[in-house]
UniProtKB/Swiss-Prot annotation:
Pfam families referenced in this protein's UniProt entry, alphabetically: NCBP3
Highest taxon of source: Eukaryota
Residue ranges of the region described as Disordered: 147-206
Any single Gene Ontology cellular-component annotation: cytosol
Organism of derivation: Schizosaccharomyces pombe (strain 972 / ATCC 24843) (Fission yeast)
Comp. bias intervals (Basic and acidic residues): 159-173
A GO molecular-function descriptor: RNA 7-methylguanosine cap binding
InterPro entries tied to this protein: NCBP3
Record GO biological process: nuclear polyadenylation-dependent CUT catabolic process; nuclear-transcribed mRNA catabolic process, nonsense-mediated decay
Stated name of the protein: Uncharacterized protein C16C4.16c
Regions of compositional bias (Basic residues) in chain numbering: 187-206
Length: 206
């Protein structure tokens, strides 16, 4: 093999293959059971109030908080394992003969939204909201993002406060820099002048 042919082979070996795909690093979700929380699927188009209404209809004695994952899934979090397990058995459609903590079960119907069909199981630590999930939410698209509404209200309140001014500003009056030239002259003229008698009394006291 001559030098030219050998050099050509080496150059071809350095050219990357366009058809090959780079190695992708897959993030493996943590499947460890989180026994203080229940994973509820099928909550599309339901508000947090409606989800809690479903929970309280069958497990009213158990206080819970809602952790949203996406439009279709959420976690129902309880104080401890026993409360969570008790709520799970109250929410399942039919008590299974052989219960498995790993399986997902059909729930009882929503009391006011019977068309909803839920699936419930123990939550896992990998059941978390992805970053910027609100940007892909269909629920926020139709009903609005409460965080944006809160920010708008805060801006509006701040703007109104700036227009009205603070109570201290009302007591002190406008700043001198905010007054026009004529207003400054008028304000100086309004200041009371001391009489000659007052001046004489001060001199006599000295």
């Amino acid at each position: 093999m001559d030098i030219v042919a050998e050099t050509q082979i080496e150059e071809e070996s350095l050219i990357p293959d366009a058809t090959s795909t780079p190695l992708e690093t897959e993030v493996v979700a943590d499947t460890t059971l989180r026994k203080t929380a229940l994973h509820l699927a099928g909550v599309d188009n339901l508000s947090e109030e409606q989800v809690k209404g479903f929970i309280s209809a069958y497990a009213p004695e158990s206080q819970c908080t809602i952790e949203w994952i996406n439009d279709n899934e959420c976690n129902v979090v309880y104080a401890d394992d026993d409360v969570s397990r008790n709520a799970l058995f109250h929410l399942i459609m039919e008590s299974p003969t052989e219960f498995s903590e790993e399986l997902e079960y059909q729930t009882k119907p929503h009391p006011t939204v019977p068309t909803c069909q839920f699936k419930i199981r123990y939550a896992r630590y990998g059941d978390k909201k992805v970053k910027s999930a609100h940007l892909y939410s269909r629920y926020y698209l139709f009903h609005g993002d409460p965080r944006e509404e809160k920010a708008q209200k805060s801006k509006s309140k701040s703007r109104n406060q700036d227009e009205r001014g603070s109570p201290l500003d009302e007591r002190l009056g406008p700043k001198v820099s905010d007054l026009t030239l004529m207003e400054r002259i008028f304000q100086v003229r309004r200041k009371p002048r001391k009489s000659r008698r007052d001046r004489r009394s001060r001199v006599s006291k000295r």
